[in-house]
């Protein structure tokens, strides 16, 4: 991400910042949050949410990692949101935090979460059925 000055204005006015976490934003987000002077968004504040909390993460290193090893992520693959189960964890984290920040709408957030979870589980069952003939097949991806 190439940070823009317009991000500072958005951060100054924000009630909640949801970060991918796993140090994906480490190169640009902390400085912007600091410059925004929005105390709610600082780590540990109610206005900051690391979406990765509670998610299962692949490729989490148990050894020392450095840049000489290439594009590695010491806290695991930051693309953790791609699994339906992690999608439920993330949505639950967001719903819970929104309910804390905006308690008058907590019932609305819980209702929307329940609907999202139901739809995601239905979709996941369809996807599992579609992919089951390929169980055990190796797949290579690149990005």
Regions picked out by a protein language model, each given a short descriptive name:
Residues 1-143:
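Extracytoplasmic metal-acquisition and chelation regions
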């Amino acid at each position: 991400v190439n940070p823009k000055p317009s991000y500072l204005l958005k951060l100054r006015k924000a009630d909640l910042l949801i970060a991918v976490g796993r140090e994906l934003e480490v190169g640009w987000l902390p400085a912007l949050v600091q410059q925004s002077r929005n105390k709610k968004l600082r780590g540990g504040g109610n206005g900051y949410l690391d979406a990765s909390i509670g998610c299962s993460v692949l490729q989490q290193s148990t050894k020392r990692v450095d840049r000489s090893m290439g594009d590695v992520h010491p806290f695991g693959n930051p693309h953790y949101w791609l699994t339906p189960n992690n999608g439920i964890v993330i949505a639950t984290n967001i719903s819970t935090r929104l309910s804390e920040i905006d308690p008058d709408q907590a019932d609305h957030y819980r209702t929307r979460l329940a609907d999202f979870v139901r739809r995601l589980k239905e979709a996941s069952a369809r996807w599992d059925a579609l992919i089951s003939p390929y169980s055990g097949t190796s797949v290579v991806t690149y990005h």
